[in-house]
């Protein structure tokens, strides 16, 4: 596939848009990064995640239904940390402090994925080639989900609004146990090469993969 190329913009739309956004925050006395509400939410999510893990693993209920409900809650907390902590941290908007953003972003590594790969596929590729089929990895859920009109249509897609939650949960496992490694060894996301990984990036990739396997598979 030919990778799309964009001409340098000749209009001032982007400049004006960024200026108006900046003016909005300044005029209303708001920060463009997280505040106490976000930090409190992050603490609640992380502590709930840790507490539920301990109860599930070391104080397992005798009632199967209770364990099943806890597993569902555990999955929701995983998604909650991903969307509310990791996402903002990896975008550099969780805090004004760089180390806190990096710490929030690293929560993804603890959940089994890798923040370096995520930044490559989301911050760089998704936000450059947004919703372009064959390039934007964030809309590649074929053949289970059709997220773009250019993707091949299967009869099952007429029901995807009913099964998409289940499909997304399975895609998460596919992500952490397959596609992360695929990107790592191929050195690219789809047709786009990723930045060269430093030694610390390799160490973080394998270290957290082993840690995740030990905590969530072996234990």
Question: Can you name each region flagged by the protein language model?
Answer:
Residues 2-11, 29-32, 112-115:
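Short intracellular "coupling" helices and adjacent cytoplasmic loop segments at the cytosolic face
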Residues 4-12, 60, 153, 198-202:
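Generic amphipathic alpha-helical segments used as scaffolds and interaction surfaces in large
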Residues 1-23, 170-186:
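Short, charged cytosolic
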Residues 73-197:
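Membrane-embedded catalytic scaffold of the fatty acid hydroxylase/desaturase
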Residues 32-82, 109-110, 161-173, 196-219:
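Alpha-helical bilayer-embedded segments of polytopic membrane proteins, i.e.
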Residues 18, 22-39:
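Membrane-interface, cytosolic juxtamembrane amphipathic helix immediately N-terminal to a transmembrane helix
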Residues 11-24, 118, 122-130:
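Juxtamembrane membrane-interface segments of multi-pass membrane proteins
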């Amino acid at each position: 596939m030919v990778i799309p190329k964009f001409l340098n913009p000749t209009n001032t739309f982007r400049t004006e848009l960024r200026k108006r956004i900046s003016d909005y925050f300044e005029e209303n006395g708001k920060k463009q990064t997280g505040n106490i509400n976000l930090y409190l939410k992050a603490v609640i999510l992380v502590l709930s995640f840790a507490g539920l893990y301990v109860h599930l693993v070391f104080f397992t209920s005798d009632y199967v239904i209770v364990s099943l409900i806890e597993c569902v809650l555990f999955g929701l907390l995983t998604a909650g940390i991903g969307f509310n902590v990791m996402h903002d941290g990896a975008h550099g908007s969780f805090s004004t402090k760089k180390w806190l953003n990096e710490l929030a972003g690293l929560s993804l590594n603890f959940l089994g994925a890798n923040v370096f790969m995520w930044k490559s596929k989301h911050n760089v590729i998704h936000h450059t080639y947004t919703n372009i089929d064959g390039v934007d990895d964030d809309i590649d859920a074929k053949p289970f989900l059709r997220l773009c009109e250019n993707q091949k249509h299967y009869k099952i897609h007429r029901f995807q609004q009913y099964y998409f939650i289940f499909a997304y949960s399975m895609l998460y496992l596919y992500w952490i146990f397959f596609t992360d490694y695929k990107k790592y060894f191929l050195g690219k996301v789809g047709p786009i090469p990723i930045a060269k990984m430093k030694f610390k990036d390799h160490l973080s990739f394998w270290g957290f993969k082993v840690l995740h396997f030990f905590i969530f598979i072996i234990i």
